Curated annotation (Swiss-Prot):
CDD domains: trimeric_dUTPase. This enzyme is involved in nucleotide metabolism: it produces dUMP, the immediate precursor of thymidine nucleotides and it decreases the intracellular concentration of dUTP so that uracil cannot be incorporated into DNA. Pathway: Pyrimidine metabolism; dUMP biosynthesis; dUMP from dCTP (dUTP route): step 2/2. It catalyses: dUTP + H2O = dUMP + diphosphate + H(+). Signal peptide: none annotated. Its EC number is 3.6.1.23. Transmembrane segments: none annotated. GO terms for molecular function: dUTP diphosphatase activity; magnesium ion binding. InterPro entries: dUTPase (IPR008181), dUTPase-like (IPR029054), dUTPase-like_sf (IPR036157), dUTPase_trimeric (IPR033704). This is Deoxyuridine 5'-triphosphate nucleotidohydrolase. One of its GO terms (biological process) is dUMP biosynthetic process. Keywords: Hydrolase, Magnesium, Metal-binding, Nucleotide metabolism. Substrate binds at R70, S71, G72, N83, L87, I88, D89. The gene is dut.
């Protein structure tokens, strides 16, 4: 299991507010919690940056982290990420912030310590481009956006 460096920026993290952790042995994402001074109400259409109380340094250029919404918050309450998916590069060392967007019709209260997102570590492959005049023919060619059919 790779080791990722973490700096605790909020003394409540690891005490009153749990550290990021996997909820089950099969979980792909670490739960991230709102390290707020007080609960806040996210109005419909409003987006706010929510601190997590920690910074990470992945260090390994073959890894990155993605921040994803929690499915229940999105489905039941319309709370998703304002940037849809957050990307944390291996050389980033600042606080992990979660952009929360209320796309639902009702105000939503985010409590101190509430689970607001999940972080998944993924492998990274950097590529170089080879410029060509034409591509070798493929069955799909330029078809996209539903081109392969509905069923």
């Amino acid at each position: 299991m790779p080791k990722i460096q973490i700096r605790i920026l909020d003394s409540r993290l690891g005490n009153e507010i749990p550290l990021p952790h996997y909820a089950t042995p099969g979980a792909a994402g670490l739960d991230l919690r709102a390290c707020l001074d007080a609960s806040l109400v996210l109005q419909p259409g409003e987006t706010r940056l929510i601190p997590t109380g920690f910074a990470i340094h992945i260090g390994d250029p073959d890894l990155a982290a993605v921040l994803l919404p929690r499915s229940g918050l999105g489905h039941k309450h319309g709370i998703v990420l304002g940037n849809l998916v957050g990307l944390i590069d291996s050389d980033y060392q600042g606080q992990v912030l979660v952009s929360c967007w209320n796309r639902g019709p009702e105000p939503f209260e985010i409590a101190v310590g509430e689970r607001i997102a999940q972080m998944v570590f993924v492998p990274v492959v950097q590529v170089s481009f080879e410029q060509v005049e034409a591509f070798a023919e493929s069955r799909r060619a330029e078809g996209g956006f539903g081109h392969t059919g509905r069923h």
